[in-house]
Amino acid sequence: MTIRLLCYMGFYFLGAGLMEADIYQTPRYLVIGTGKKITLECSQTMGHDKMYWYQQDPGMELHLIHYSYGVNSTEKGDLSSESTVSRIRTEHFPLTLESARPSHTSQYLCASSEARGLAEFTDTQYFGPGTRLTVLEDLKNVFPPEVAVFEPSEAEISHTQKATLVCLATGFYPDHVELSWWVNGKEVHSGVSTDPQPLKEQPALNDSRYCLSSRLRVSATFWQNPRNHFRCQVQFYGLSENDEWTQDRAKPVTQIVSAEAWGRADCGFTSESYQQGVLSATILYEILLGKATLYAVLVSALVLMAMVKRKDSRG
């Protein structure tokens, strides 16, 4: 089974059902080298006394690593962690790693809840969006994605009167990406289906690069309009400008990588031919306009000459 086929077919689901509220986490994605000190920020605006930090590895359940019942109260959770936390203010609960290691690679989720009892963890917890942390021994393994858009098949269009564009992002590491579709300059969500998670291109390798596929389905009529523009945009979260880089290729910093397609009419009338037609029509119009102007000048000259002759004959 090919890598691209795996990307088309793969679906990966997280088991945790999380409630998002006014919980803010920064950064959303972070890739760093071994030994760096990092702080993951978490804040909430609901005035909750209880706050929590969880760690979740891919495909695994949440593990509580730290919690707090209020200002200056911090406790360790049920999972041994080399991180530390502080609670100087009610709304603020940062988590710090003094010396990051590859084993710290994971997703870190911050949550809060109302205080209804110190010993109970059954209160409704509100979660932030999470921070995806990747710690690497060598930053040369970081690669941005290559992105391609594949046009709909004629068979689908003729049988269903629908058109599905496929976007494929390949060759990126780590899996810190967000994919979106844009039509005529505006982001769209209707008709979009994106894989829940990126897939490893070589599942047997720990440092395998990733791929991600997404589909945008529109009506055949909409696709067959050459004026419609489709763009697949992949936001890649890579290195920062401050990270040291000694490789002979471009530094894989945080960046946007895109691919695009134009609508294609069913009679072979492509966006290129449409634009060429518009250009030809514009030139023809200018030629005709020029001829009309020249004709008007000639007519005016003839009228003037006739008036002069008439005046001379009267004289």
From Swiss-Prot:
Q: Which GO terms describe its molecular function?
A: signaling receptor activity
- Which top-rank group of organisms is this from? Eukaryota
Q: Which residues cross the membrane?
A: 282-304
Taking every annotated instance into account, which residue ranges of this chain make up the domain Ig-like C1-type?
A: 145-254
Region feature (T cell receptor beta joining 2-3): 122-136
Its signal peptide is 1-21
Tell me the Gene Ontology biological-process terms attached to this UniProt entry. Answer: cell surface receptor signaling pathway; detection of tumor cell; T cell mediated cytotoxicity directed against tumor cell target
Where does the record place the region T cell receptor beta constant 2? 138-315
Q: Where is this region: T cell receptor beta variable 25-1?
A: 22-114
| Renumbered residue ranges of the record's region CDR1 | 46-50
Every Ig-like V-type domain range:
22-114
- Keywords recorded for this protein, A-Z: Cell membrane, Disulfide bond, Glycoprotein, Immunity, Membrane, Receptor, Signal, Transmembrane, Transmembrane helix
Location (main, coarse): membrane
Listed name of the protein: T cell receptor beta chain MC.7.G5
Q: What gene is this protein translated from?
A: TRB
